UniProtKB/Swiss-Prot annotation:
Gene Ontology cellular component annotations, sorted alphabetically: plasma membrane
Entry protein name: L-carnitine/gamma-butyrobetaine antiporter
Gene: caiT
Keyword terms: Antiport, Cell inner membrane, Cell membrane, Membrane, Transmembrane, Transmembrane helix, Transport
Residues making up the signal peptide according to the UniProt record: none
Principal subcellular localisation of the protein: membrane
Compartment(s) where it occurs, according to its Swiss-Prot or TrEMBL record: Cell inner membrane
Taxonomic classification: Bacteria, Pseudomonadati, Pseudomonadota, Gammaproteobacteria, Enterobacterales
Length: 504
């Protein structure tokens, strides 16, 4: 019995430091929002302007790593001795499901507006050239390049899971081949895990900060309930309580069903937008945008704008690369776990093709719809953002479609379910990472899960209180900096161990 309690207890060295650090930062922010915004702007400017190039080189190097895996000595190596756990169709569907979060719905609907109103390469705002590049840049930021970087890390984690038979719930577990067991399980490993957890907490709080206003704006549109910060806080509280009830009552099967419903509803809603918005235009715009992407790809890869200093690569490319970096470990662990029995080449190709198709469909359909609404003067996005905020502008891109009430109900349900599953996943991941020897498939303690969901909810509320996108972007970039190095160490550790232990 004591042994069982030990297994389900918290791990103090990785539980309390992130809790204290995040708690102090939240307190300092709430204490003086104006001063916090000044610091946020300074941090954002420093990291993106001084170190933005490093994120760009990181993505390029990881892309070369993907080619090495696909065509190198490990291409035909199998990740485990068992046959694949899931059929290829189910495997790809699970990948798609991982892409349909409310944060993705947020960016997919509004991102193109920012690209055409503040375009790269010195183009005139809202010009034909800016519109031609708008979707192309979305395809760049959410296309093969970032998924290729995830492929490398997914192979690394799958190798440690299924070839080396290691229990990996924190990144330090994978660093034994690189730094030795003493350091991996000592102070160095603890520091690495704490960096990972603090960054992950902020990333999840950021996702909640993006998702919540979509739900509350839907409520205003459907029920006439005014959207306020207090309503955001109430909705987040309800999600936390609902998550606690689901966990306490053993309703995790219900949460998994909700996740499946989210995926099917995503297909349905995207299909609806595709049909009624303008299928012919969407396909033509996508085709043209792929050509623009191929034409400008070298410039996009290395674009830092040091002369004109327009700020586009810092505000978007570096931000998104930090976004990908910060979620890399969590996402790669999930993708690795569903890829048991596949070869390295299968995993790399499957991820890049399957996940790129998922994100490209989302961004093409939603972005094209937004551009059409702008061109036809059906909605005035700058005015909506200035008066009501970004979330209202996104809601109006959906409300402008035919059968607006039915469309809004569908979008409301989709966002609500997506956020319920987000809160559940947040609490589960953080609880698993901060508890002692909770093994895969076991449930971490209820109070720990509730505690982490509360903290993530608080961060979401704090970011919403700060207002605007800059605090959200800064939280991602600041969190991405330490994980930049952690991801590299995990990659190097895999390469070193594979050379020694994964021979013919």
């Amino acid at each position: 019995m004591k042994n069982e309690k030990r297994k389900t207890g918290i791990e103090p060295k990785v539980f309390f430091p992130p809790l204290i650090i995040v708690g102090i930062l939240c307190w300092l922010t709430v204490r003086d929002l104006d001063a916090a915004n000044v610091v946020i702007n300074a941090v954002f400017s420093y990291v993106t302007n001084v170190w933005g190039w490093a994120f760009e080189w990181y993505m390029v190097v990881m892309l070369f790593g993907w080619f090495w895996l696909v065509f190198g000595p490990y291409a035909k190596k199998r990740l485990g001795n068992e046959p694949p756990e899931f059929s290829t169709a189910s495997w790809i569907f699970m990948m798609f499901a991982s892409c349909t979060s409310a944060a993705v719905l947020f960016w997919g609907s509004i991102e193109i507006y920012y690209y055409i109103s503040t375009p790269p390469f010195g183009l005139e705002p809202n010009s034909t050239g800016a519109k031609e590049l708008g979707l192309a840049y979305s395809l760049f930021h959410w296309g093969p390049l970032p998924w290729a970087t995830y492929s490398f890390l997914s192979v690394a984690f799958a190798y440690f899971f299924f070839v080396r038979k290691m229990e990996v719930i924190r990144p330090s577990s994978t660093l034994v081949p690189l730094v030795g067991e003493k350091h991996a399980k000592g102070l160095f490993g603890t520091i690495v895990d704490n960096f990972y957890l603090v960054a992950l907490i902020f990333a999840m709080g950021t996702s909640l900060g993006l998702a919540t206003p979509l739900v509350t704006e839907c409520m205003q549109w459907l029920f006439g309930i005014p959207h306020t910060l207090q309503l955001d806080a109430i909705i987040i509280t309800c999600w936390i309580i609902l998550n606690a009830i689901c966990v306490a009552c053993g309703l995790q099967k219900g949460v998994r069903i909700a996740s499946d419903v989210r995926s099917y509803l995503s297909f349905l809603m995207l299909g609806w937008v595709f049909i009624v918005s303008g299928a012919s235009f969407i396909m033509n715009y996508f085709t043209d945008s792929v050509g623009m992407l191929l034409m400008y790809l070298p410039r996009m890869l290395f674009y830092t704008d040091p002369i004109a200093k327009g700020g586009f690569p810092q505000g978007w490319t570096v931000f998104y690369w930090a976004w990908w970096v910060i979620y890399a470990i969590q996402m790669s662990i999930f993708l690795a776990r569903i890829s048991r029995g596949r070869t390295v080449r299968e995993l790399c190709f499957g991820m890049v093709l399957g996940l790129t198709a998922s994100t490209w469909i989302l961004w093409t359909v939603l972005g094209s719809n937004t551009l059409l609404l702008i061109d036809k003067n059906i909605i005035n996005i700058p005015n909506l953002i200035e008066q009501y905020g970004v979330a209202r502008a996104i809601i109006e891109t959906w409300a402008a479609l035919p059968l607006s009430t039915a469309t809004m109900w569908g979008f409301f349900i989709l966002c609500f379910i997506a956020t319920v599953t987000l809160v559940n996943a947040c609490s589960y991941t953080l609880a698993m990472s901060t508890c002692r020897e909770v093994r895969d498939g076991e449930e971490p303690p209820l109070l720990v899960r509730i505690g982490w969901s509360v903290l993530v909810g608080i961060i979401g509320i704090v970011l919403l209180a700060l207002g605007g996108l800059k605090p959200i972007q800064t939280a991602i970039i600041a969190g991405g900096c330490p994980l930049f190095f952690v991801n590299i160490m995990v990659t190097l550790s895999f390469i070193k161990d594979a050379k020694q232990n994964w021979k013919d």
